[in-house]
Design a protein with these regions (language model features):
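Alpha-helical solenoid scaffolds in eukaryotic macromolecular assemblies
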Residues: 1-195
Length: 195
């Protein structure tokens, strides 16, 4: 009831305290339900951090294998950058569980959101993963995906530049109506025929 009218930017500490209360005096499952509810009830800026907290508590209370559902829900609900970060973390978890193919698929998914020139972290993680666990074919596939993502990012940048160049430039100077303006307000009108 305390959280029904609580603004989302202030809800995070209340959810965490409520979950810890359930952990200490209640049931672990109820605490996890509180943390799940917190992922929807906090401000958008805190959602990724809340998902990470929920995943850590799930691993602690019921085991690492149960974190899969939380990761999958987080990836589907967060924006591109959050999904990229959570997918890369999920790949590490899958690798700990011995699921090499699932980890590779998650890294491939996360890499779709990261331009190799501006955000190389995921690409370095995938590169290191393929060096340790991959084959020549899987490494070549990683390089192919990397070129594809780079090309898509370049195309998107080019389209944005073209769109910006099409927009009219607004002048900071006021526009003067030349039809009513005179060069010299003291000018005397002289008829040329009289000369």
């Amino acid at each position: 009831q305390a959280l029904d009218g609580c603004p989302s930017e202030y809800a995070k500490p209340v959810f965490v305290a409520y979950g810890q209360l359930e952990e200490t005096y209640g049931l672990a499952r109820r605490a996890l339900r509180v943390y799940e509810r917190a992922t929807r009830g906090v401000a958008n800026a805190d959602r990724l951090e809340m998902y990470r907290f929920y995943i850590a508590k799930t691993a602690e209370l019921v085991g690492v294998a149960h974190t899969r559902a939380v990761y999958e829900r987080g990836i589907s609900e967060l924006g591109d950058m959050g999904a990229m970060q959570l997918s890369a973390e999920y790949a590490q978890t899958e690798l700990q569980l011995g699921e090499v193919d699932r980890a590779r698929a998650l890294l491939a998914y996360a890499a779709q959101f990261a331009d190799p020139r501006t955000d190389p972290r995921v690409w370095q993680q995938w590169h290191d993963f393929e060096v340790q666990h991959g084959s020549e074919d899987s490494f070549k596939e990683m390089l192919r995906v990397k070129r594809s993502v780079q090309a898509r990012a370049t195309d998107a940048r080019h389209l944005a530049e073209v769109e910006l160049s099409k927009q009219p430039v607004k002048s900071k100077k006021p526009v003067v109506d030349l039809s009513t303006a005179t060069a010299n307000p003291d000018e005397v009108a002289i008829d040329d025929d009289d000369l």
